[in-house]
Structure formats: C-alpha cells, structure tokens
C-alpha cells in the first residue's frame, strides 16, 4: 500500500492537525447547516462514509441530538479515535469493496449520508459511491464535499488523485445512481486565499506538520488559523469561483 493510502499512519500523524484545520471546520459547518435545513423535523439516521477521526460526528452530536450516527472508516486508528470522541455513535472499520458481515444489519439504514473529502482519494469515485449505496434508504439524501481548484504538493502527498468541478462531481453522482439536486462552489473568496497559502507552502507543509511547532512558530500558526476561521464566515455559499465543491443528491430507488 502506498504511504499516502496508509490511513492508520495518516490519522496517527495528522489527527491533531486535521481537528484544528479551519478548512475542515468550515466544511463541517456547511454540512451541518445542510443537514439541519433538510431534516424536516424527522429523526435522522446519518451515515458518515469515510468518517476519519470522528470530527464531523463531534459537530453533529449537539446540533442533532435525536439523530442516530453511524460511521464507516477504513482505518482502525481513525475508528478508535472516533469512538473515544463520540461514544454515543457507532463506528465500523470497513472497506466498502469488501464489507464486513456486520454491515449487513445496516442495509437501507441511512436517511442521510455524508461523504466528505473522500472521493479525491479513491481511484474510482463512482464505484466507491455505488459500494456505499446499499446502506442508504431509497430517497435518502447524500451530501458530498470534494476539493476544487488547483492541487497542491501537500494534496498529492496525502493521496489526492484528482480535484473536481461542478460538472465532474455531477457526472460521478449520476453514474453511481444518485439524482443530483444541487452543486455549490463554496468558499470564495477567503477559502481560495487559504488554499493559495497551502499551495505556496507545498511539500514543506507536510514537514511542518510532522515536525510539530513550538514557541513563536506555533503562536503564528495558531494566529493564522484563527484569522481564517473568522474570515471563512464571510465566504459565499456559491459562486463560480469557489474552490470547495459541495453536492447534494438523492438515492434513486
């Protein structure tokens, strides 16, 4: 397995940095808003496909206290961290192309599903979504986030195969058996600016994260992240310039 596909190593190395990442926090806020707006007062059963280290569940738990939360994640390290963070949720170590027998109990289970920052890491995004499809109820809503805009050296370092456009993610969802309701190009202008910083830093960003920071460097990094967290509140939900792609689709029965 290539290093950039070793998800145990990924979460062991990057778990803390991912939790503090203002871009991840921005995405989770967008997802939470979409889930809340479409809940229609019914108890939700939410499946996080590629649940990582559970940060989305941490965000959703207080906002949707009646919802049942389920996560599928390839990495045992990610599942362990997730279970510690959100003991009320259920997590499985799962390769959807070779699913464990326990997942059979969740066939048609999800009223809502999320697949956030996963599809850029797989060779066939449509095949991956088709493998996840059996765990969604007919008519279930799927929220997908994927990166748009240019790819950085750090993106390649952590295993990005491709970035997406509005048309490309729509095509992937349709091929996987979903009806696309809308695709937003979010994040303009300040997420784009943040991404330009990441692109400029390149592979050195991986060294920064691996080495850790102390003293003035740590203070500066935290200050920059705090500034972007504030600026991200001013981002547009949709414009033709946004580099954060957010799609909402429905499972076709």
Language model features by range: what are they?
Residues 140-146:
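Conserved beta-strand signature within the Rossmann-like core of class I S-adenosyl-L-methionine
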Residues 1-108, 112, 116, 126-129, ...:
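Conserved N-terminal segment of class I S-adenosyl-L-methionine
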Residues 178-189:
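Conserved S-adenosyl-L-methionine
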Residues 66, 88, 139, 177-180:
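A generic structural signal for alpha->beta connector loops
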């Amino acid at each position: 397995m290539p290093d950039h596909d070793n998800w145990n190593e990924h979460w062991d190395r990057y778990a803390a940095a991912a939790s503090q990442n203002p871009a991840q926090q921005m995405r989770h806020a967008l997802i939470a808003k979409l889930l809340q707006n479409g809940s229609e007062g019914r108890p939700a059963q939410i499946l996080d496909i590629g649940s990582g280290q559970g940060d989305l569940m941490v965000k959703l738990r207080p906002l949707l206290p009646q919802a049942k939360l389920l996560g599928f994640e390839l990495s045992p390290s990610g599942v362990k961290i997730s279970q510690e963070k959100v003991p009320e949720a259920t997590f499985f170590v799962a390769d959807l192309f070779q699913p464990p027998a326990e997942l059979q109990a969740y066939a048609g289970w999800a009223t809502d599903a999320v697949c956030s920052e996963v599809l850029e890491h797989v060779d066939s995004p449509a095949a991956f979504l088709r493998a996840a499809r059996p765990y969604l109820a007919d008519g279930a809503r799927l929220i997908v986030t994927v990166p748009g805009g240019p790819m950085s050296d750090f993106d390649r370092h952590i295993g990005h195969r491709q970035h997406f456009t509005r048309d490309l993610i729509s095509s992937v969802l349709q091929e996987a058996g979903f009806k696309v309701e809308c695709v937003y190009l979010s994040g303009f202008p300040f997420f784009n600016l943040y991404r330009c910083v990441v692109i400029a830093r390149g592979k050195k960003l991986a060294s920064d994260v691996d080495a850790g920071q102390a003293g003035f460097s740590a203070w500066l990094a935290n200050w920059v992240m705090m500034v972007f967290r504030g600026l991200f509140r001013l981002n547009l939900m949709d414009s033709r310039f946004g580099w954060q792609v957010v799609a909402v689709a429905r499972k076709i029965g």
